């Protein structure tokens, strides 16, 4: 406390001229010098500090604006992605539904085609069996006829001797002769 009062008391006392010294005792320094230095610092530092604060404020505001724009862009992209997702889900459901219907329709078509093929094969089988049966019947008829002819020839050959043969020929000649007389 004494130092403070001493500094105010010694206002009228100036150090000798010709020497320049820094007074490191803050409480002993001249309040006028301090007020001048502080005034200069405030006057010049205020502009620099205001410029620094304004630049910082502008950077913060531009960062906030950029962040807001990015946020809006992200929200728009999210909405577009949601819309696309809904469309894709709807299309997937349609494809799934159409796929099930298509599978059932193809299954029915395949079953119908298989039934038709089986029916045609059954008809071909029946026709083939009928033709094979007819061929077998015709073959048996031919063999029976051939055997009957061979027996008849055998019977005729055994029954006919030369005398019967001549009588048959003479009888046929007489029949032909009488037919000629009728036609004349």
UniProtKB/Swiss-Prot annotation:
Keywords: ATP synthesis, CF(0), Chloroplast, Hydrogen ion transport, Ion transport, Membrane, Plastid, Thylakoid, Transmembrane, Transmembrane helix, Transport. The gene is atpF. In plastids the F-type ATPase is also known as CF(1)CF(0). It is a single-pass membrane protein. The chain crosses the membrane at residues 27-49. It is found in: Plastid, Chloroplast thylakoid membrane. This is ATP synthase subunit b, chloroplastic. GO terms for cellular component: chloroplast thylakoid membrane; proton-transporting ATP synthase complex. InterPro entries: ATP_synth_b/b'su_bac/chlpt. CDD domains: ATP-synt_Fo_b. The keyword Ubl conjugation does not apply. Belongs to the ATPase B chain family. GO terms for molecular function: proton-transporting ATP synthase activity, rotational mechanism. F(1)F(0) ATP synthase produces ATP from ADP in the presence of a proton or sodium gradient. F-type ATPases consist of two structural domains, F(1) containing the extramembraneous catalytic core and F(0) containing the membrane proton channel, linked together by a central stalk and a peripheral stalk. During catalysis, ATP synthesis in the catalytic domain of F(1) is coupled via a rotary mechanism of the central stalk subunits to proton translocation. Component of the F(0) channel, it forms part of the peripheral stalk, linking F(1) to F(0). F-type ATPases have 2 components, F(1) - the catalytic core - and F(0) - the membrane proton channel. F(1) has five subunits: alpha(3), beta(3), gamma(1), delta(1), epsilon(1). F(0) has four main subunits: a(1), b(1), b'(1) and c(10-14). The alpha and beta chains form an alternating ring which encloses part of the gamma chain. F(1) is attached to F(0) by a central stalk formed by the gamma and epsilon chains, while a peripheral stalk is formed by the delta, b and b' chains. HAMAP family: ATP_synth_b_bprime (MF_01398).
């Amino acid at each position: 406390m004494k130092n403070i009062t001493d500094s105010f008391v010694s206002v009228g006392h100036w150090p000798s001229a010709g020497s320049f010294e820094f007074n490191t005792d803050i409480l002993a320094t001249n309040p006028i010098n301090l007020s001048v230095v502080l005034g200069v610092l405030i006057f010049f530092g205020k502009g620099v500090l205001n410029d620094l604060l304004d630049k910082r404020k502008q950077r913060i505001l531009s960062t906030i604006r950029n962040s807001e724009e990015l946020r809006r862009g992200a929200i728009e992209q999210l909405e577009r992605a949601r819309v696309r997702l809904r469309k894709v889900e709807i299309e997937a459901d349609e494809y799934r539904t159409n796929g099930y219907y298509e599978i059932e329709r193809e299954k029915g078509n395949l079953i119908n085609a298989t039934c038709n093929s089986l029916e045609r094969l059954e008809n071909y089988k029946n026709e083939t069996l009928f033709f094979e049966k007819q061929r077998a019947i015709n073959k048996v008829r031919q063999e029976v006829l051939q055997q009957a002819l061979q027996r008849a020839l055998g019977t005729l050959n055994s029954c006919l001797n030369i005398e019967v043969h001549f009588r048959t020929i003479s009888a046929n000649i007489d029949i032909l002769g009488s037919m000629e007389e009728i036609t004349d």
